[in-house]
Amino acid sequence: MALKNKVQLITYPDSLGGNLKTLNDVLEKYFSDVFGGVHILPPFPSSGDRGFAPITYSEIEPKFGTWYDIKKMAENFDILLDLMVNHVSRRSIYFQDFLKKGRKSEYADMFITLDKLWKDGKPVKGDIEKMFLRRTLPYSTFKIEETGEEEKVWTTFGKTDPSEQIDLDVNSHLVREFLLEVFKTFSNFGVKIVRLDAVGYVIKKIGTSCFFVEPEIYEFLDWAKGQAASYGIELLLEVHSQFEVQYKLAERGFLIYDFILPFTVLYTLINKSNEMLYHYLKNRPINQFTMLDCHDGIPVKPDLDGLIDTKKAKEVVDICVQRGANLSLIYGDKYKSEDGFDVHQINCTYYSALNCDDDAYLAARAIQFFTPGIPQVYYVGLLAGVNDFEAVKKTKEGREINRHNYGLKEIEESVQKNVVQRLLKLIRFRNEYEAFNGEFFIEDCRKDEIRLTWKKDDKRCSLFIDLKTYKTTIDYINENGEEVKYLV
């Protein structure tokens, strides 16, 4: 299935107007000619993590709408939805049955009880110390209702104890049947792309980091890709890992996220030097989705491990913190840098990270749109939103700094901002200009400049950025064969 080589929007189901119907109205009113696709962050009933602890996929959270709202949107846009392939909610019917009946539950094999890893079911500290942890311990303890016995079950994620997010055993035939049902549901309502969220964590194996365990993970990924394809669905893998892992996935034909680009662009604009960006652009896989911002923070570790000196990385992090950002940190000393650098993600809006400088922000988007891949723009970034400190204070969740919900009046006002109008014009150019379906060139220039070019047949467009001033221009050949200069 051919995906549209056009910019996509990323949004929560309730962040642009309050629900899916209003989201569709907003898209039709303001952005009908702007986006080729829409990534709707989890609209399913969920018990936590703003949708990422799914109770069921068979229905949409009623306050957001119904599956038919998704189907209507799919008439005009490539729809992308998340499949939390690593876990489900502890309030799902499957885990609720397990909580009641324990090992006698017909769904017991869907979950990872500790005896699947350690024969006696007792965790070994030395093994856990080798793991790439997302919480202090990778399991939670639950009491079984009918027996009163305690069961320890694997829970990679979750900020509560016990966790709301219960890991699935992807080697279980029950889990594979469950995933097939999800693909079928998605296909029935017009979903074209499925993002496998947290897929790097699905294989648990003692003696490893329990993150992207090779070669076992490839068996699962190949199975998932084949099954999704049978329903006309493309898979997009969400894997935060070292650069080498991204290359391995790309070589196996998987669509992946370019999680390295956001920090690289930020570094380039803050330091007014193209060196890191040029080195990266010459060595990255092509079949990627590009982004600068998303519902999580700007990736740092482990995505940039080996690509940047931690001292230089810390300088950029410190500037972002001065501009209002907060940080998500790495758990486990083994996965921190030797000098103790432990920043996992920088939580802030991309516009705020660039000090709300319109020209710098448009330069960043121009770099993103000229980088090979399908670009995605997060809804806060679309409206050049600033850090939402009130949301952080209210929720005690650092990532809420970049998850502001916009009402209709606020959307109308934001769309009229000069920086947003300039961004919309740039998005339209990226979508419509034919050369972006051609060949990409990185042009030699001074270190304080950027020159990137796309060519196809008689069409050519060249991006020039003066990093000293952030002035951004695009020279292109129009339909009459004339050279036009476009000041972004």
From Swiss-Prot:
Q: What is its EC number?
A: 2.4.1.329
Which GO molecular-function terms appear in the entry?
1,4-alpha-oligoglucan phosphorylase activity; hexosyltransferase activity
Keyword Transferase tagged: yes
Q: From which lineage does this chain's organism come?
A: Bacteria, Bacillati, Bacillota, Clostridia, Thermoanaerobacterales
Recorded catalytic reaction(s): these are:
sucrose 6(F)-phosphate + phosphate = beta-D-fructose 6-phosphate + alpha-D-glucose 1-phosphate
Family, per the entry? Belongs to the glycosyl hydrolase 13 family. Sucrose phosphorylase subfamily.
What is this enzyme's class at the first EC digit?
transferase
Positions with a binding annotation for sucrose 6(F)-phosphate: D49, H87, R195, L196, D197, E238, H295, D296, D342, V343, H344, Q345, R399
pH dependence of function: Optimum pH is 6 and 6.5 for the synthetic and phosphorolytic reaction, respectively. Thermostable. Has a half-life of 60 hours at 60 degrees Celsius.
Its domain of life reads Bacteria
Q: Where is the active site?
A: D197, E238
This chain's protein is named Sucrose 6(F)-phosphate phosphorylase
SUPFAM superfamilies tied to this protein: (Trans)glycosidases
* Gene name linked to the record: spp
Q: Return the SMART domains for the record.
A: Aamy
How it assembles, according to the record, is:
Monomer.
